[in-house]
Amino acid sequence: MGIEEGATKVSRQFTATCFRMEQRPATAAGTITLGGDLTVNRMGFGAMRLTGEGIWGPPDDRAEAIRVLRRAVELGVNFIDTADSYGPHVAEEIIAEALHPYPDGLVIATKGGFERPGPGKWATNGRPDYLRRQLEGSLRRLRLDRIDLYQLHRIDPKVPANEQFDALRGFQREGLVRHVGLSEVTGAEVERARGVVPIVSVQNRYNVSDRQWDEVVELCEREGLAFIPWFPLSAGDLDEAGPLARIARRRRASVYQVALAWLLARSPVMLVIPGTSSVAHLEQNIAAAELRLSADDLAELAAVV
């Protein structure tokens, strides 16, 4: 059974209770401000799953993908994360189809820096000319004049890092990009980039049992940057005898909801972006914004690593 399919009857009951209490449950996560001028709810949405298998091609059900995006906004989501490479291009096109003209306050973040040779295949490309083509394509597909948050998907080891950072700074000066973020970077790389271009966010893999980027979370806290965790649940966390499952049973929630609630509790700079291609799973994910873990719950999860 996959992560999204693991929601139990009790988790659906928890979700329904949250929706009776708060018709825009994403707001319960609180807010974070990016770059001093973009305030968003800390429960966002990640668009990677709005594509085909291997993050390639169109989704099996495009109409459902559109419903997911519209429902996310109805539930209070005002931060959507995507990338040129999701599809490629597919997720950005669906976002525009579903939501343009965009509601006031909706922030769309996208990323560049990958080529897609085929399904499930990724190759870094941080050449400035390639990044420019990707950015121009994203602007066109999203029907925007400026990207609110443009993230370097990976630092390309084949291209001097400062050339990549310089390109991002140039896009910002041209008015094509409002703010800049990084993905899968060390603390030292964040600091190096900040010497070239203002950085407002970091998107790294992070979850209850994979906390290798704790030092980056702490850096983000010190410097007022958003930390956007991807892959919020590892396969091992689904163990029915594990702490996440025990807490989920006590809380009448799903393991996935507990994992998301832990991330939100981990740090005030966390901006979570759970993704799905199903409206039902979307509602379960967003309901996690209402889930408050106790001190005992958090202590139990602190012992996972």
What are these regions (language model features)?
Residues 58-72, 126-142, 186-192:
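Short, acidic/polar
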Residues 35, 96-107, 140-143, 194-196, ...:
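Acidic (Asp/Glu)-rich catalytic clusters
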Residues 139-158:
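Active-site groove signature of glycoside hydrolases
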Residues 2-106:
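N-terminal binding-site loop/beta-alpha segment at the start of enzyme catalytic domains
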Residues 51-55, 115-122, 238-239, 281-284:
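A short acidic, helix-capping loop that chelates divalent metal ions and anchors anionic groups
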Residues 105-118, 184:
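A short, structured active-site edge motif that brings together acidic residues
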Residues 14-31, 155-305:
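Beta/alpha (TIM)-barrel catalytic core signal, keyed to glycine-rich beta->alpha loops juxtaposed to Asp/Glu
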Residues 57-64, 90, 94, 122-133, ...:
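Alpha-helix N-cap and loop-to-helix initiation/capping positions
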